């Protein structure tokens, strides 16, 4: 049997909002250590990896490993029925073909329960190699979302150039071009407002803005975002989920002088 209770149910709502536009269905792997999900998007360009550790839940029980095929759009629709303050409990029997979702109002005066049909999914797990990155940029997540949104009005790809003193985002299009440069902040009162750069060697890579704008749907999950880059390997865009885990997106760089991203 599986049962997980989350007093801060809004976290789960935000996770689904961050996933549903990029991937339509995915296998949730439930185990004693927590919940994980790994999936390519439908066009096989980007990869999503989610970890929610068991200790981040208020109660968590998973007697044996379960692979649960979920239509993310359906789950998102059901979670929209939960209030932001609601306590959310997920429950499934070992060989169940449904997932129960229970929403309790904080005052205990209203309890809603839903059952969602599960899917049979044939999923191949991709190994994600551990990697040292040439540049790691940590910045406010809302700032990154704004940059991606603004530059997508200019062009459909962004060049991210990372050097010791700052990181530059550039786009070219029919109307002209745009450049946004962020300098490393030296002293900021609030850590989440800082821009920090760890650089082993400078990097300049091009990425499709369409996908970055999908990734920034995760902005409400975390005040900061971390971008990890190296030549010829996928960019990692990571949002920490406080006390629980993380949501990571991987996107391969576009090869220069080619129309199609590889």
UniProtKB/Swiss-Prot annotation:
GO terms for cellular component: chromatin; nucleoplasm; nucleus; PCNA complex; PCNA-p21 complex. Residues 61-80 bind DNA. One of its GO terms (molecular function) is enzyme binding. Monoubiquitinated by the UBE2B-RAD18 complex on Lys-164. Monoubiquitination at Lys-164 also takes place in undamaged proliferating cells, and is mediated by the DCX(DTL) complex, leading to enhance PCNA-dependent translesion DNA synthesis. It is found in: Nucleus. It comes from the Eukaryota. Keywords: DNA replication, DNA-binding, Isopeptide bond, Nucleus, Ubl conjugation. Disulfide bonds: none annotated. GO terms for biological process: leading strand elongation; mismatch repair; regulation of DNA replication; translesion synthesis. It holds the Pfam family PCNA_N. There is a cross-link at residue 164 (Glycyl lysine isopeptide (Lys-Gly) (interchain with G-Cter in ubiquitin)). Its main location: nucleus. This protein is an auxiliary protein of DNA polymerase delta and is involved in the control of eukaryotic DNA replication by increasing the polymerase's processibility during elongation of the leading strand. Belongs to the PCNA family. Homotrimer. Forms a complex with activator 1 heteropentamer in the presence of ATP. Interacts with DNMT1. Interacts with CHAF1A. Component of the replisome complex. This is Proliferating cell nuclear antigen. It comes from Gallus gallus. The gene is PCNA.
């Amino acid at each position: 049997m599986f049962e997980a209770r989350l007093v801060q149910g809004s976290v789960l709502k935000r996770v689904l909002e961050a996933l549903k536009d990029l991937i339509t269905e995915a296998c949730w792997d439930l185990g004693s250590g927590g919940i994980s999900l790994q999936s390519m998007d439908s066009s096989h360009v980007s990869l999503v990896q989610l970890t929610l550790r068991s200790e981040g839940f208020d109660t968590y029980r998973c007697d044996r490993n379960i692979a649960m095929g979920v239509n993310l759009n359906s789950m998102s629709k059901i979670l929209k029925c939960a209030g932001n303050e609601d306590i959310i409990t997920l429950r499934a029997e070992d060989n169940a073909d449904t997932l129960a979702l229970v929403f309790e109002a904080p005052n205990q005066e209203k309890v809603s329960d839903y059952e969602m049909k599960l899917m049979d999914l044939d999923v191949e797990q991709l190994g994600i190699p551990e990697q040292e990155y040439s540049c790691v940029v940590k910045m406010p997540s809302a700032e990154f979302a704004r940059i991606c949104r603004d530059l997508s009005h200019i062009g459909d790809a962004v060049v991210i150039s990372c050097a010791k003193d700052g990181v530059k985002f550039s786009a070219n299009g029919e109307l002209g071009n745009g450049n946004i440069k962020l300098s490393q902040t030296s002293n900021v009162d609030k850590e989440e407002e800082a821009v920090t750069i760890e650089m082993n060697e400078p990097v300049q890579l091009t990425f499709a803005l369409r996908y970055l704008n999908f990734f920034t749907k995760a902005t409400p999950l975390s005040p900061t975002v971390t971008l990890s880059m190296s030549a010829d390997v996928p960019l990692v865009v990571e949002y920490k989920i406080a006390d629980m885990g993380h949501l990571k997106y991987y996107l391969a760089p576009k090869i220069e002088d080619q129309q199609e991203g590889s």
